[in-house]
From Swiss-Prot:
Coiled coil: none
Consequence of gene disruption: Male mice are sterile due to profound impairment in motility and morphology of spermatozoa.
Oligomeric and partner information: Microtubule inner protein component of sperm flagellar doublet microtubules. Interacts with HSP90; this interaction stabilizes and activates TSSK6. Interacts with the heat shock proteins HSPCB, HSPA8 and HSPA1A. These interactions appear to be required for TSSK6 kinase activity. Interacts with TSACC; this interaction is direct and recruits TSACC to HSP90, which is essential for kinase activity.
GO biological-process terms attached to the record: flagellated sperm motility; peptidyl-serine phosphorylation; protein phosphorylation; sperm DNA condensation
Residues annotated to bind ATP: 18-26, 41
PTM note: Autophosphorylated. Ubiquitinated; HSP90 activity negatively regulates ubiquitination and degradation.
Similarity section: Belongs to the protein kinase superfamily. CAMK Ser/Thr protein kinase family.
The protein's enzyme class: transferase
GO cellular component: axonemal microtubule doublet inner sheath; nucleus; sperm flagellum
Catalytic activity: L-seryl-[protein] + ATP = O-phospho-L-seryl-[protein] + ADP + H(+); L-threonyl-[protein] + ATP = O-phospho-L-threonyl-[protein] + ADP + H(+)
Protein name: Testis-specific serine/threonine-protein kinase 6
Cofactors required: Mg(2+)
Origin species: Mus musculus (Mouse)
SMART domains the record matches: S_TKc
């Protein structure tokens, strides 16, 4: 039986494709069982290289089966088909953080603090459970229709991590969100990589632009070492700027832990920027 026919028999009606990767695509669908809209990630293991099938995909599935957090995407079920396809049925989202930034120009201070607090809390949960994401970026942060609640998604580069000296060597994620040590090919602490990526996400949220020009990847670490600049005329609190500076420390050991980020004073502050 084909995968699409099986899904139909299980009460799913597939809709349009809303995302596509090298070996997978994400489709929106309606579900009789879950009485509403869901997202279904379709993974074609026949087209994927052995490294993906034997290493990265099992890690992703293990994480998705084990995590339970209000700000991490929830998976309803996994459907395996004999033709090599795997269907991952999960929560659907109205939009993502990148689309919200592009639509609004930037995220206002109080809303940015609310959303970033949720993101930081989810990353803290992962790290407390010895898990890392390694591909945190605005398009992997899903948003509710009112743009007040987040869900972190896409654990394709996720893995277990127990901290130093349990270092990673795989280049993961997008260059624009990658930390200096990852770009330089140095064995890295993946938790500190996640923290760097949090800094990039926060900068994008509050400014509407990337902190570093990534058109020349070879020169990117040099620009990262110089630190960030802010657009002229941008109103942003010093507490927020200070948090961004902490997250984007060139030296991994100088960056805070995810737990320290979640407790940062700006996230509890009453100022608007």
């Amino acid at each position: 039986m084909s995968g699409d026919k099986l899904l139909s028999e299980l009460g799913y009606k597939l809709g349009r494709t809303i995302g596509e990767g090298s070996y997978s695509k994400v489709k929106v669908a309606t579900s009789k069982k879950y009485k509403g809209t869901v997202a279904i990630k379709v993974v074609d293991r026949r087209r994927a290289p052995p490294d993906f099938v034997n290493k990265f995909l099992p890690r992703e599935l293990s994480i998705l089966r084990g995590v339970r957090h209000p700000h991490i995407v929830h998976v309803f079920e996994f459907i395996e088909v004999c033709n090599g396809k795997l269907y991952i049925v999960m929560e659907a989202a109205a939009t993502d953080l990148l689309q919200a930034v592009q639509r609004n120009g930037r995220i206002p201070g109080s809303q940015a603090r609310e959303l970033f607090s949720q993101i930081a809390g989810a990353v803290r949960y992962l790290h407390d459970h010895h898990l890392v994401h390694r591909d945190l970026k605005c398009e992997n942060v899903l948003l509710s229709p009112d743009e007040r609640r987040v869900k972190i998604t896409d654990f394709g580069f996720g893995r277990q991590a127990h901290g130093y000296p349990d270092l990673s060597t795989t280049y993961c994620g997008s260059a624009a969100y990658a930390s200096p040590e990852v770009l330089l090919g140095i064995p890295y602490d993946p938790k500190k990589y996640d923290v760097w990526s949090l800094g990039v996400v926060l900068y994008v949220m509050v400014t509407g632009c990337m902190p570093f020009d990534d058109s020349d990847i070879a020169g990117l670490p040099r620009r990262q070492k110089r630190g960030v600049l802010y657009p002229d005329g941008l109103e942003l609190s010093e507490r927020c700027k200070s948090l961004i500076a902490e997250l984007l420390q060139f030296s991994p050991s100088a960056r805070p832990s995810a737990g320290q980020v979640a407790r940062n004073g700006w996230l509890r502050a009453g100022d608007s920027g």
